[in-house]
Amino acid sequence: MIRNILKMGDERLLRIAPPVPAEMFGSSELETLIADMFETMHSVGGVGLAAPQIGIDLQLVIFGFERSERYPQAEAVPQTILLNPLITPLHPGVEEGWEGCLSVPGLRGMVDRYQSIRYEGFDPDGQPIERIAHGFHARVVQHECDHLIGRLYPSRITDFSKFGFMDVMFPDMDPNADE
C-alpha cells in the first residue's frame, strides 16, 4: 500500500525515532511496513525512505537502486533494509553534493556529508548488517538516517546560495526529481 509522505513543517518529522523492538523482528507487521515503504518509495521514484517520513516512529530506513532518474550520474546502491542503524565515519573528510528529499518537495540544496562511512544495524529478521559505503551510497545512508534523529537536510546547508527551487536552479531537470 502506498503511504502518505509527510512534508517539512509536519512536527512528526522532527521526532527522534525509537529503536525497532526485538519482538518486532521477523513479524508480519514489520514485513507489511517494509513492503509499503518500498511501494511508496518506488511510486515516486525515490532512492531512499525512512519510516518517520510516513509517520512511523521507528528506526527503519530503506534505500537502493540500480539506476536513478533523479540522480542519473549516481552509481548503483544495493537495495537495503536497515533497522536500528549506527553510522561511523571512516575518516573526517567530507564532500559536498546536491540533495533533495521526498519530504521537502521541489527543493535541492548543497550538503556536506562524510565521504566514507561504516554502517551497522539489523535486517528485518534481526540478523546483523555491517557495510562500508563511499560516495553517493554513503550520502544516501546518512540522509536517510538523519530522518531517524528528526533532522532534514536543509538544516545541514551552510551556503544558502546553493539552496532553492529545482525549477529555478535546474530548469532543464525533471521537476519531479526532488529526492
From Swiss-Prot:
Picking any one GO biological process from the record gives: translation
The cofactors named for this UniProt entry are:
Fe(2+)
Top enzyme class, one word, equals hydrolase
Q: Which residues bind Fe cation?
A: C101, H143, H147
Q: Family assignment?
A: Belongs to the polypeptide deformylase family.
The keyword Transport appears for this protein: no
What is its biological role? Removes the formyl group from the N-terminal Met of newly synthesized proteins. Requires at least a dipeptide for an efficient rate of reaction. N-terminal L-methionine is a prerequisite for activity but the enzyme has broad specificity at other positions.
Keyword annotations from UniProtKB, A to Z: Hydrolase, Iron, Metal-binding, Protein biosynthesis
| The keyword Hydrolase belongs to this UniProt entry's keyword annotation | yes
- What is an example of a GO molecular function annotated in this UniProt entry? metal ion binding
| Source species of the chain | Pseudomonas syringae pv. tomato (strain ATCC BAA-871 / DC3000)
Q: What is this protein called?
A: Peptide deformylase 2
Q: What's the source species' lineage?
A: Bacteria, Pseudomonadati, Pseudomonadota, Gammaproteobacteria, Pseudomonadales
> Per the UniProt record, which EC number(s) apply here?
3.5.1.88
